[in-house]
Amino acid sequence: MGKYIEQYKQMYYCGDMLFYWLGDICKLIDLTEAKSLLDFGCGQGKQYCGWGDLDAHSTLGMMPALYDPGVEQFEKMPKGKFDGVYSTDVMEHIPEEELPESLELIFSKADKFVYLAICTSPSMATLPNGENAHCTLEDIDWWKEIVNRYRPTDILTHIRTYNQHDQSENFEVIA
């Protein structure tokens, strides 16, 4: 894993996309009675530090473990498994050939649920090398197919895709 990691280390992603999907994640926490969480691709983690009136861990009811290979402070994967693993605005940044490894890692850390929010349109951000920050742009059916290849059948999985340009969304539950 890591074709673009050095590129992302030069950028400053704060983690604010999580706020769009907190409602979905909170429903999964309640449904599964989750007691531990992992934010896979947390960015700089500012969403957990009280950002004005916004404070994600208060909304979630707990502080998640944080992982982001592009941020030095969070580049080490937390040990153990978690009831829930969520990843928002991350998968589209991973090259297609590296997705199997990433999905296997995500599912290996989850005991009850996985939530993926994935953008399906080009990013407004450009990497330092000039490439668009979203390198894997596919529709929800494609994502559902690849996720199903790596998803254990006992892990409740929700996929939300969205297009940031036309504000369209799709939602799939894989039970």
Where are the predicted features?
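N-terminal substrate-binding region of glycoside hydrolase catalytic domains
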Residues: A125
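A short beta-strand submotif of the Rossmann-like class I SAM-dependent methyltransferase core
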Residues: G84-V90
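Conserved N-terminal segment of class I S-adenosyl-L-methionine
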Residues: M1-G84, E97-E104, K109, T120, ...
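Short glycine-centered segments of the SAM/dcSAM-binding site in methyltransferase folds
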Residues: K112-Y115
